[in-house]
Amino acid sequence: MPVPWFLLSLALGRSPVVLSLERLVGPQDATHCSPVSLEPWGDEERLRVQFLAQQSLSLAPVTAATARTALSGLSGADGRREERGRGKSWVCLSLGGSGNTEPQKKGLSCRLWDSDILCLPGDIVPAPGPVLAPTHLQTELVLRCQKETDCDLCLRVAVHLAVHGHWEEPEDEEKFGGAADSGVEEPRNASLQAQVVLSFQAYPTARCVLLEVQVPAALVQFGQSVGSVVYDCFEAALGSEVRIWSYTQPRYEKELNHTQQLPDCRGLEVWNSIPSCWALPWLNVSADGDNVHLVLNVSEEQHFGLSLYWNQVQGPPKPRWHKNLTGPQIITLNHTDLVPCLCIQVWPLEPDSVRTNICPFREDPRAHQNLWQAARLQLLTLQSWLLDAPCSLPAEAALCWRAPGGDPCQPLVPPLSWENVTVDKVLEFPLLKGHPNLCVQVNSSEKLQLQECLWADSLGPLKDDVLLLETRGPQDNRSLCALEPSGCTSLPSKASTRAARLGEYLLQDLQSGQCLQLWDDDLGALWACPMDKYIHKRWALVWLACLLFAAALSLILLLKKDHAKGWLRLLKQDVRSGAAARGRAALLLYSADDSGFERLVGALASALCQLPLRVAVDLWSRRELSAQGPVAWFHAQRRQTLQEGGVVVLLFSPGAVALCSEWLQDGVSGPGAHGPHDAFRASLSCVLPDFLQGRAPGSYVGACFDRLLHPDAVPALFRTVPVFTLPSQLPDFLGALQQPRAPRSGRLQERAEQVSRALQPALDSYFHPPGTPAPGRGVGPGAGPGAGDGT
C-alpha cells in the first residue's frame, strides 16, 4: 500500500485558506458613496473632517502607487465664475449601472455613467486650484449570481478620495480662466466636482467606466479624506491576473494602479455555486518508496489535460511533460524528478475551461536536495560563468583556493566578497588570469551546496603553487601573506610552515616577475607563485643521499662476491618497478580549432593524468611555449618523449586534417594561419619524416572523437599507425599507451570507464552547449555522421 504523503485537492477539496464570498444578485453594475462627516467651522469658514465608521465592506487594503489628482471645478451661485470642462477630474473605474446623486448638504455624492467609455488618460497638466483626487484603492472578491448555483467571480473596487491643492482668492477673474459670468459664486457655496475613471484589465477582458463625484467646498478641509466610492463590480475569470488603474481626466498626477492574482476553485468555499468548477478533476499526491503517484479521480468518460512544468520566477514556465488523458489515471514520478518549482496543471478538455495549477513540492526536503544535485556551474569564458539549475535558488558565490593534498578549499573572502547568484544569469569574475587551483563555492543559508574548479579542464590538474595575498595601505604601504591551510602566513615570517621557510625566495620570485597575478584592485592583489623548483631542490638532496647509499652498498657487494649477483638482480628489478610506477610519457598534439575543442583536449589530458601516464600538452606549458617558440618546444618534447620510450598521440580534428592535407600537397603551410601556440602546426616538419621513413609505428598513435571526425577522413599516410575513436575505443586506446612489453592489466576496462566518466561532461558541453551551438563543430573534411547536429 502506498504510504500517504500528503493529499491535495486541486478543485473539489477544501484548502486550508478558503474564501467565503458575499453574493450580489442581478447583472447590473452599481455604485454608492461612503462619505465622511463634513461640517463647517462657523464664522471662520474653515473646514474640518470627521471620519465616520467604515461600512462593513471587508475591503482588503491595497498599497497604491503615486496618485493622479482629479481636476475639480467650482459650481454654485456665490458670485464666482464657474469653470467647466477644465474644472472636472476623471478617474478610470469599471463602474456600471445608473448611480444616484446625493444632495450637496449631505457631503460626498456620486453617479455612475450608464455605459463604458474609452480610456484616454492624456498628459499630466498643472492643477488650477483645489481638486478631488483618488488616494488609494481597495478590492474585495464577491459573487455575481443569476441563480443560487449560477455565479461568477467578481471584483469590488473602492476608491478613496481627498482634496489636494490650496484655495486661493483670485485677484482678478483671469486666474480662473474664461469670461466673466453674470453670477459670482462665493467659495462656501461652491462645490468640488470630479470625474473619476476606473480601468480594468484581465485577459481577454478590458473595461473602462466613468464616475462623477461631487462634494460641497465649504464642508471639506484640504488634504483630508472626503470619503470613498464603491463600485460593484468587475467580472473576472478564476485564477486570472487582473490590473486596475485609477486616474483623473485631465490628469494632474500619476495614476493609482494595482495588480491582483485571483484564486482558483480550490481557494473558494463556494465552488459549488460556480459552474466552471464542477468539471475539474480531483488530484491526490502520494508517495510509495522512491516513487510519487499523481492520482486523478475522474469519471471514465471525462477527457482532461495534465501538464508538468517548472515554474520560473523570471521568464515563462518551462514545460516538462504534457498529455491528454481519459478517465481515472495514476501518473508515477521518480523522486529524483522532484524539484521545488515542479508544478502541475490540470483542466477538462472543454472550450474555455478553467485551468488549475498547484506546486506541491515547494517545501519538500527531497525536492530541495534534488535541486542542488541538478545544479551545475558552467564556465563560459575566462571571466564569465553561470549557474544552471531547474529552479531559482537563493544563493551566493565566492572564489576559493584549493591546494593539492585534499585540504579544504579556502574562500578568498576577503579580499573578494560574496556575490548573489541568479540562475541562468551570466556573472563576471574579477580576475585577470585563470588558474586550475581557483574554484567556485556556492552557499545557500550559510551552507556549502556546490563547489567546482571550473578551470581544471582547460588549464590542467591542480598545481603545487602558493597563493600570495597583497594588501595595500595608505602611502604605498603594502604587506604580503601566503595562504595556507592554517591561515595566511605573513612574509617574511619565522613560523614553521612551508611558506614561511621559503618566504625570502617567494618574495624574490614576486619581484622578478615569476609569479602570476590573478586579481588586482586598489586595495590589494592575488599572486600565484610556483613551488616546483623548490620541491625539485629538496628531491635532489634525497637523490644524492640515495646515490651515496647505493655507492656504499655496491662497495659492500663487491667485497662479498658470492652475493653480488643476487643483489644486482634485486636492484635491477627495483629500477624496473620504479619506472613502471612512474608511468609512460605521452606527448599530446592537436590543432587548436576553437576554444571549445581546447577545453575538450584539456579534459582528455586531465583524465589521462589519473592513469600511470605522464602527459605533456601545450595547453599546460604556455609560458615555456611562448619563451622557446612552438618549433623548439615541440622538438624538445618529442625528443625527450621518444628517448624515454614514450608515445606521441596525434589527436585529429577537422582543422588538423586540413593542415596535414595542406602539408602533403605543398610541403609547407602558409604563414600566419595560426597563432604562436600551435604546436601541431610546428610539429608537422618532423612528424611527416617519421611517417615517410617508416619510424612511426610503435612511437605514434592516432585518435579522434566519435561525433567530430570519422577515422577514414584521416590521411592514409597517418593511418599506418593505429587510429582510435574516442570514447568508443577507449580500452584499445589505453592499451596502446601502455609500455610495449607491459602485460595487459585486468583493470584496463575499469580505467577506460574511469576516463570515459571524466570525459563525458566535456563532450556534452562541446556537442550540446547552452544557448548556441559551439563553432567549428562538424566543419571540415570528413566530418562524421551527426557531427553537425550532435546526434
Swiss-Prot record:
Annotated disulfide bonds: C265-C277, C341-C391, C343-C359, C400-C409, C439-C453, C481-C488, C515-C529
Main location group: membrane
Stretch list, region Disordered: 762-791
Gene Ontology process terms (BP): defense response to fungus; granulocyte chemotaxis; inflammatory response; interleukin-17A-mediated signaling pathway; positive regulation of cytokine production involved in inflammatory response; positive regulation of interleukin-6 production
Location within or outside the cell: Cell membrane
Positions annotated with a glycan in the UniProt record: N189, N257, N284, N297, N324, N334, N420, N443, N477
Transmembrane segments: 539-559
The keyword Transmembrane belongs to this UniProt entry's keyword annotation: yes
Keyword terms, alphabetized: Cell membrane, Disulfide bond, Glycoprotein, Inflammatory response, Membrane, Receptor, Signal, Transmembrane, Transmembrane helix
GO molecular-function term, one example from the UniProt record: interleukin-17 receptor activity
Segments in the Cytoplasmic topological domain: 560-791
Name of the protein described by the UniProt record: Interleukin-17 receptor C
Species of origin: Homo sapiens
Gene behind the chain: IL17RC
